[in-house]
C-alpha cells in the first residue's frame, strides 16, 4: 500500500514577534527565518518520517527547487513533481511569544495543477492506496472524484477552509481530518459533538477526526467513537501541529494499525512538533516519537470527561450573554469550586477564559456564515461593545 500526497509546496517566511500584528500596526520582528512549508509538504514529511511510503505530487516554481530536495531527503518519492517557470507558492507567518501564529498564503504554483496532470499522476496508483489532500491546491474536487473512482482511500484535511469546499461530494472521502473550527464551517455544527452527529447523518460512510487542541482529538466511524487526550507540551510554534497529526494519522492507516494506536502516536508527534520552531523542520521521526512517549504526560481525558466537556460547551453556547460559573455549577450539580476546577482541568483555562473563547468562536462563526453587522454579532455573543477584534480572534481561536 502506498500514500500519494497531492499537496502544496510553499516557502515559509517566518517572523518572530512579541504579538501578532493587527490593522494599522507596525511591529519589529525579533527574528526572521525561511523554511520549507505548505500543508502538503509538511504532511508528506510527517508521513515519511513516520515510516510510510510517500509519493508527493505538486507543481513547484523556479525558486522552489529546494522543496523537492527537502521531500526527497526525508524519504518521499518526488518523481511525480512538475516544475513551472513561475514563482513558487509561499506563506508569511507571524509567530508570537506564546507560539501562536497568523498566516497569509500566496498560492502561486499550487494553483497550476490541471486535470491532465492529475490523470497522469493517478495512473501510478491503484485501489486500496491512500491519497492525502489539503485545500491549498487547484482541482481538489476533480482529484477526489477521480481517486475515489479508482478505489483509492481519500484522506482530506480541508484546510484552509474556503468556499470551494462547499460543493465537494463528501461521501467520496474516506477520512476527514480537521480542527473544531473547520468542522463547524464544513458540517454546520456549533460544537465538535454536534458536528459528529451531523456527520453521522450526512456522511455515514466517512470517518471523521476532529482535533481539539489541548483537549485532544476525537475519531468517529459509524457508531464507533474514540477519544484521545492531548499530550502536555511547552508550545513555541504551533504551525505544523495539524500537519504532523495528519501525516502520522495517514502513516498509521497505511500500516493498518488500530485507530487507538494511530491517534495516540499522531497526538504525541504533534505535541513534539509544537515544542520546536518551524514547520517541516519541527516534525519528529517515528523513532523520536517512540522514544519520547514513555516520558510524555497525557492531559487528563476520557469518554466521561468528553461528556462533561460537552455539557460545559452546551451550557456556555446556549447562554453566551449570561453564562456564569455559578450557572454552570447549578447545571452540573457541582459546587462552585468543583465546577471551576473541572473547567480548568478539561480545557486548561479558567471559566472566564473558556467562556470568552466560546464567545469568540461564535462571533467568528457568525462573521463567516452571515451578513450580520459587527455591532449585532457583538451583542449576540454577549459583548456590550464591539470588543472582539481581529487580533483577539487570531489569538484565541486555534
Q: Which sequence ranges carry the predicted segments?
A:
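Short hydrophobic/aromatic patch on the recognition helix
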Residues: 339, 343, 388-389, 393
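Substrate-binding N-lobe of the ribokinase-like
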Residues: 3, 23-90, 292
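Conserved phosphate-binding/catalytic region of the ribokinase-like
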Residues: 163, 193-300
